[in-house]
């Protein structure tokens, strides 16, 4: 790999570079969230990845349930396996601490083959909602809540 090809690696976050230490980066996981929030995507060796490279996946991954089965829908040409384009968002690049090798994980934006956004992609939906808030000069605030229960042991 030429030094030009891996210059982008020097621009990774300090936290990732600290995690990587002196290990050679081996693999990149290009991931997207599906409609249920499950991570989907593909892994590849580092020599096949650059931030400017796009990748394709079949749109049918949006027809899968969380158990991997396919949804029964009446959509014209549902099974034509049209490709969607993954475009890496390098601002999301992070380490995969549970991987055996030094691995980079990058969330991708989803596009159609003509370059337009895939409207059903969760990240694109969120971007659209955020732009609507911005037009109204509003700022959304979230308040995640971790739910848990305190129970006594059942000795039956």
Residue ranges: model-predicted function:
Residues 1-156:
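ATP/Mg2+-dependent ligation/transfer catalytic cores
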């Amino acid at each position: 790999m030429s030094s030009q090809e891996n210059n982008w690696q020097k621009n990774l976050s300090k936290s990732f570079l600290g995690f990587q230490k002196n290990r050679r980066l081996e693999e990149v996981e290009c991931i997207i969230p599906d409609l249920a929030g499950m991570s989907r995507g593909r892994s590849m060796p580092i020599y096949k990845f650059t931030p400017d490279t796009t990748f394709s996946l079949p749109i049918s991954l949006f027809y899968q349930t969380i158990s991997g089965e396919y949804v029964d829908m009446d959509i014209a040409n549902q099974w034509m396996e049209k490709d969607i384009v993954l475009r890496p968002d390098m601002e999301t690049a992070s380490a995969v601490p549970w991987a055996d090798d030094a691995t980079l994980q990058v969330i991708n934006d989803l596009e159609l083959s003509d370059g337009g956004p895939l409207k059903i992609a969760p990240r694109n939906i969120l971007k659209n909602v955020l732009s609507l808030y911005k037009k109204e000069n509003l700022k959304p605030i979230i308040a995640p809540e971790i739910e848990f229960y305190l129970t006594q042991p059942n000795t039956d």
